[in-house]
Amino acid sequence: MRVIVKGTSPHENKIITIFEKQEDGKYKCYNIEDKYFTINEEQKKEYRTKPRTTPYLFIKKNEKDKKLKTMSLKQQCESINETAKLLLELTNGKINLYRTGSTAKTALQLFYDLCEPPTPEEIETYEIDILEKSSTGACIWGQKGYKNIGYKYDFVSEYPSIMDSSQHKFPIGKGEQKTFTKKEFKNLEFLSFGLYHVKVHCDDRRVFRENYDNWYTHTELNYAKSKLNYKIELIIDDEPNALLWDKSKLITGKALFGKFVTYLFRLKYKGHTEVKCFLNALWGTLCQTDMMKIIPTEIRCDQQILSITPCDNGKYIYETARLDKFYENNFARIKPFILSYGRVKIQNVILQNIDKVVRCHTDGIICSSPITNIKLGSDLGMLKYEGKGNCEIINNNNFIFIEIDDDI
């Protein structure tokens, strides 16, 4: 049976409508048939909760994309309609923005259609806290004050390459809590698939990212132990100090995501850059928190506050998530593992070029001299040379890179 993504229209094309909220609380909308019109909050909820009965497919105005955020509602709508028409023809209907709308929903629907994945088990409350605490972000640092020639490299579609790997596994079932003694943990030569509550004694943040909640995946701990020879100290308190998965609860990235990644990467490789956003969006979409925006009189005990935003009327908007249904999708168990696979991948490159690398950000690095000990290329997952430039590193997050003629 085909899985239908919530908020999409599975059998009928809709009118793509771009909207943005105005200061009066109403929503200004635009589509190519009705042009500009305005709806209130109740109408918006009615339209968006019943996408199969309304003629419209609503998409929030994009304020993040560098190109799109400079456009008006009309310009964004025209741009998306052009892309929708192109993709519909290019993919023979496999990607139909007139039915799915947003990048996230389109990627998710294509994943279900191409891969027909197994149904993951419900994520239990005891898993959520550990999954979140183990989900350290990307490797980001810079050699402050560096001002010289830089050579830029990055991995080709790093996260999709991890998802397409037969070497990397992901959980699709419930993890089992375990409490190790220090003796038991010390006797483990190799840590099996799971999450561990430990203290890692790190002396070089270029090659290892510390987690301040002290929860790590087996991947980064095995790397810290075998490659870096770091001391790993088990934490013992009143709670379990590991969440482990049996082999029967795991699936390889290739088996789970392979058809999705292969299909889109082939199109991207042929120059159809319109599909890049879907290729990169899937894993984040699967890990999305099921958030609600509310102006409450009180926060229920089954809700966790994620953020608080003040309103002009003196009230506050709370972003919350249910503690018993924290994620939108039960594939969200992949979150800490895909992040750690990505970190360890680039940290291995840094380790082999420790005297050259002056900046790292997620899947890209800048070096003071060319890399010669790693095979470069443009295939999925390979390290690719991006160019040479005058580089100034201001801090971990900010740098200046002005490309110059390349003699490599």
Explain the meaning of each model-derived region:
Residues M1-I408:
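Conserved acidic
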